[in-house]
Regions:
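Charged/polar low-complexity intrinsically disordered segments
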Residues: 4-9
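N-terminal nicking endonuclease/strand-transfer module with a His-rich metal-binding environment
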Residues: 12, 19-214
Length: 214
């Protein structure tokens, strides 16, 4: 494969190139560098008055009721939703292929009023790619980076008459364990000294740090 040039050039040969998307490379047929790069990562937090169900309903252009608070979010009139898809790890419950079931499971599992419910990636897509290539690009990126780690992915591709294709990728904050149940977001590990021994703090407790699992 040939890497994509860092800057636009006048001529391109017909070949397979590597397209850089959100820090990863994917082979796509005859790609031209994207005109305007955009990629934003954010957290859907209940503490900020947001909900995963509302976000999923808006991104997909659907009507979904949040079982956590009883609110119904209807975005069926939203324009520009050209593709939606849910990607699940092999051990996920089959019912999670339904958008309402997936995100209501997340909402009901998280009890805290300030819970972090989902992670979202908003990224521009190259207009030079066909719709099928745009979908494949996002699907392969999500499968390799997130589904392989046990996370559930709900992505949507939006486009309007102005020609601004972009994707919204929603990720579960928790991975699924081998039984298909929600697992911990992070795990605790002990800090070790140069001899491999646990470091004890003045309080008598051992020094630890958290490792994010997603």
């Amino acid at each position: 494969y040939a890497a994509i040039p860092a800057h636009p050039q006048k001529q391109y040969t017909r070949r397979w190139c590597l397209y850089h998307f959100c820090g990863s490379c994917y082979p796509i047929r005859e790609v031209i560098p994207i005109a305007i790069y955009h990629c934003n990562i954010s957290i859907v937090s209940r503490g900020k008055g947001k909900s995963a169900v509302a976000a999923a309903a808006y991104r997909s252009g659907e009507k979904i009721t949040n079982e956590w608070d009883g609110m119904t979010h209807d975005y069926t009139r939203k324009r520009g939703v050209v593709h939606t898809e849910i990607l699940l790890p092999p051990h996920a419950p089959p019912s999670f292929s339904d958008r309402a079931t997936l995100w209501n499971s997340v909402e009901l599992y998280e009890k805290a009023g300030n819970a972090q419910l989902a992670r979202e990636i908003d990224a521009a897509l190259p207009i030079e790619l066909s719709r099928e290539e745009q979908i494949r690009l996002v699907r392969e990126y999500c499968s390799s980076q997130f589904v392989s780690r046990g996370m559930c992915v709900d992505f949507a591709i939006h486009d309007t008459d102005k020609g601004n294709p972009h994707c919204h990728i929603m990720l579960t904050m928790r991975p699924l364990d081998e039984r298909g149940a929600w697992a911990a977001k992070s795990k605790k590990e002990y800090d070790l000294d140069e001899n491999g021994e646990r470091i004890r703090l003045p309080s008598g407790r051992y020094k630890t740090h958290k490792i994010d699992l997603t």
